[in-house]
């Protein structure tokens, strides 16, 4: 009996000395739970605000808020073409920039006839570096540009190891994915600042979310574009300029035609038209968004994954696509 009493006494002493630590752990646990709940509530509210409310209460008057003319780079296919069409639906005149004159003429004519807006185009190959911009400067001179969409981008032929990439591919990716956005902003931003209104949309990628092996240079270039956009937003928001970074996941376009899985529209891989119709409704509402509600869920989960899990999954997925592309190439 005495042994039992001694044990009870010892237990009470230990419990008394540990009570402070138990209370501290309880406070930490409560704080963590509240923080996670608030994050969930905020993310849910953000998704509703971005992707549901604009459809219910009506979208902003883009022409009135930003201006009558928009410039869209990489605008003869995929997201660029679809985004240009969405702008035209809202009464915005479009200036298309791409490297194929035939495609530019066809898309320009189609948009003008379908949406009854003015269109123009400039032939420019962004992979050529500095020489591409003189024609652009001349073409945009004396134009009051209200919206700039930096969509032009270069992707790998298929996911691959860094040492397998050619020097030409590396330079082209730097010129197209990084330099083009800098130069286009540098050309049109002064006019926007002078009018104290304008919008710049830079199409980044969800690969900027975390390091993405086998898309190393592409992912890094899109991470640059994302950071560039976010810094530019804070730098010029007070001057009436809205800057947005779009960070979509895979969209079923020609850019990802290396795989039958990613090039076909599905639940997680929307068409360019479907994506653009959602993305444009976020203009003026979010400085950084995947632009599509399903991609927003994926992006939120991706950001919260440990880096090694993201990297493992990305490399596994990229290896499958690479194998498929090489098999198809060998036939």
Curated annotation (Swiss-Prot):
Signal peptide coordinates: none
Entry-linked InterPro entries: 17-beta-HSD3-like (IPR052149), NAD(P)-bd_dom_sf (IPR036291), SDR_fam (IPR002347)
Annotated Gene Ontology cellular component terms: endoplasmic reticulum; mitochondrion
Keywords: Lipid biosynthesis, Lipid metabolism, Mitochondrion, NADP, Oxidoreductase, Steroid biosynthesis
Binding site for NADP(+): 74-80, 125, 222
Positions of the catalytic residues: 218
Record-listed E.C. numbers: 1.1.1.-
Subcellular location: Mitochondrion
GO molecular function per UniProt: oxidoreductase activity
Gene3D superfamilies named in the record: NAD(P)-binding Rossmann-like Domain
Source domain of life: Eukaryota
Positions annotated to bind substrate: 205
Region span, Required for mitochondria translocation: 2-82
SUPFAM superfamilies linked to this entry: NAD(P)-binding Rossmann-fold domains (SSF51735)
GO terms classed as biological process: fatty acid elongation; steroid biosynthetic process
PANTHER family hit by this protein: INACTIVE HYDROXYSTEROID DEHYDROGENASE-LIKE PROTEIN 1 (PTHR44889:SF1)
Family affiliation: Belongs to the short-chain dehydrogenases/reductases (SDR) family. 17-beta-HSD 3 subfamily.
Role: May catalyze the metabolism of steroid hormones and thus play an important role in sex differentiation, the emergence and maintenance of the secondary sexual characters, and the regulation of endocrine.
Protein name: Hydroxysteroid dehydrogenase-like protein 1
Organism: Gallus gallus (Chicken)
Gene that encodes the chain: HSDL1
